[in-house]
Amino acid sequence: MFETVEHGVREQNDVFFSSPLDPIHEFPHTEGVDELTKLSREGYLFLKANEIDRAEAEFKKMLELDENNNYALVGLGDAARKRNKCKEAADYYSECLRYHPGNNYALFGLADCYKNMNLYAKAIEIWEQYLEHDNANITVFTRVADAYRKIHDFQNSKRLYLKVLEIEQDNPYALIGLGHLHYDFKKYREALFYWQKILEQNSENVDIRILTSIGNCYRKMKQFDRGVYYFEKALEKDPNNFYGLFGLADCYRGMKQQQHSIKYWEAILKKDPNNKVILTRMGDAYRHIGDYEKAEKIYQQALDIDYDSYAILGLAILCKIQGKYDEAITSLTHLMQADRRNYRIYLELADCYIHTNEKAKAIEVLQAFQQYGIKNQAISEVLSTLQN
């Protein structure tokens, strides 16, 4: 739901709402109703019971009696959506709107399909049409705000989330959305404000994703000790939660307590043994605690899976630490050509040249990085020291 972990490990899924619209409430429950109404009511009852095949059969019978029946077309769209066949569902909803423009159920379903197909601009367009008929629907306002967030439209997204809070103070979906929105734009303090409101509402049974999201805010703000508390709380709920394990390991890494991070990297690798990012992080941890043999083995394990620049960097740093400067320089020079904007490579290469008393080459390497127009304090400080 909340973030893409470093180097694109994986992303949590957003909370999706179930549809608040239910056509079954519109059908009369009196005796003597006509055949279409009876079929429609039975179809939607089957749909609610998740008997999708039987529901579809009822809706198709309706189309035999009335080929453009709005309830049948929407019902078939809903059935397809339940099967996660969004394209098929969208076709049914669109067909309904051809003959019944402004049909709320078709508009809602179509917009939801577009959202699930990541066609957010189209989803927004349809939801805006829906709001012309129902301009106080909190769920739709929240979904439109979510869609604006997905296309990185901060102002419109925030405006609609806040509109929901005007209608319903402390609406959890709006608060969660505002947390995501500010987090996406690196406004971590603001994101923290909204997610903590959710925590205050239900501190005992809060969703684990809120705990990891709050932890991630503190992690991003480099308040690692505060992040540890929330990641530990998350792991109390689920000891194998990826985001709790990753966050806790990364916080200990940030606090320079690599010896504590290792067991959490290992816990992730038990579930995902071929995760190169985690392998390189664990290799770094062993390197920092001085277990160079173990670190080298783990970096190589990552490279056996596939090329990984961080594993190569780790091996080069090991060479430098062990005084194998020529080997480190060769490796870092090749790596620099493949990843020209990674400042760490330039710093490590310059440090190798400093150790081999080649000050001019160290300066040349650092100046080469600055030619890309990227400001980096560490590069500037080392360069200034060398030039003075």
Where are these regions (language model features)?
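Residue-level recognition of tetratricopeptide repeat
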Residues: 35, 69, 103, 137, ...
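TPR alpha-solenoid repeat register
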Residues: 38, 72, 106, 140, ...
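Canonical tetratricopeptide repeat
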Residues: 41, 75, 109, 143, ...
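Register position in tetratricopeptide repeats
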Residues: 48, 82-83, 116, 150, ...
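Structural marker of alpha-solenoid helical repeat scaffolds
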Residues: 65, 99, 133-134, 167, ...
